[in-house]
């Protein structure tokens, strides 16, 4: 993901919300992955990323827009989902994953902290006991494991993912729009209490982490691997 990606997603969602004929939104990835997290390859050698600004201006507004949208958002996780993409996926209302998909949060491994709502949504979905070691150790979580943990609603064979998503989206579109929007609002109000403060805290701590020597070394190692 790049800054532009988050901005384009938010703009697309706003356009959909403004069209009364649209009753549901589907979010998926282009290509093999759902999302690979923030694109560190955009950084120059030795550059210190302004992660507070990245989150405040680009990614946190997207998460807020998704949760506040009148539209039910179906997240179609079509492949690997890493870093900030996990938070964006979990910000959806109905999450359907391909059987080959997995979820991966490498933040701590590169001297960063979870962001884009990760530290809010994942503990509330799976519980602190499962979320804490998963985030600290950065182990990959398969789609089947995510289903068992309650992170996703349904897992389907890769070949059936598009058809299943379309069928669910069609069912949602048949519902009364006002009732759907009000129900989503009730659920978000019940589960996202303190989301604004949480996103702000993620932003601040990520900014601090992004200025540490460990993070600089992690970025240098990543860029070196890319060149190699």
Show where each model-derived region lies:
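Short, hydrophobic secondary-structure boundary micro-motifs
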Residues: 25, 54, 180-182, 195-199, ...
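Hydrophobic alpha-helical membrane-association signature
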Residues: 5-9, 58, 161, 202
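Terminal low-complexity tails and localization/encapsulation signals of metabolic enzymes
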Residues: 220-228
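Glycine- (often His-adjacent) and acidic-residue-rich active-site loop
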Residues: 1, 29-65, 81, 109, ...
């Amino acid at each position: 993901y790049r800054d532009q990606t988050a901005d384009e997603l938010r703009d697309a969602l706003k356009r959909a919300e403004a069209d009364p004929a649209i009753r549901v939104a589907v979010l998926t990835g282009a290509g093999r992955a759902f999302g690979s997290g923030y694109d560190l390859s955009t950084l120059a050698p030795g550059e210190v990323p302004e992660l507070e600004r990245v989150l405040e201006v680009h990614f946190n507004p997207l998460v807020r827009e998704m949760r506040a949208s009148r539209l039910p958002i179906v997240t179609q996780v079509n492949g690997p989902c890493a870093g900030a993409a996990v938070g964006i996926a979990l910000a959806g209302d109905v999450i359907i994953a391909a059987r080959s998909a997995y979820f991966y949060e490498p933040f701590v491994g590169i001297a960063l902290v979870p962001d884009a709502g990760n530290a809010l949504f994942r503990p509330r979905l799976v519980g602190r006991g499962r979320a804490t070691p998963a985030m600290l150790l950065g182990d990959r979580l398969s789609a089947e494991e995510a289903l068992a943990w309650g992170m996703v609603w349904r897992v389907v064979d890769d070949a059936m993912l598009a058809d299943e998503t379309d069928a669910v989206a069609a069912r949602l579109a048949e519902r009364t729009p006002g009732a759907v929007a009000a129900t989503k609002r009730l659920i978000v109000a019940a589960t996202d209490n303190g989301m604004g403060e949480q996103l702000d805290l993620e932003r601040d701590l990520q900014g601090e982490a992004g200025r540490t020597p460990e993070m600089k070394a992690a970025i240098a190692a990543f860029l070196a691997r890319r060149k190699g």
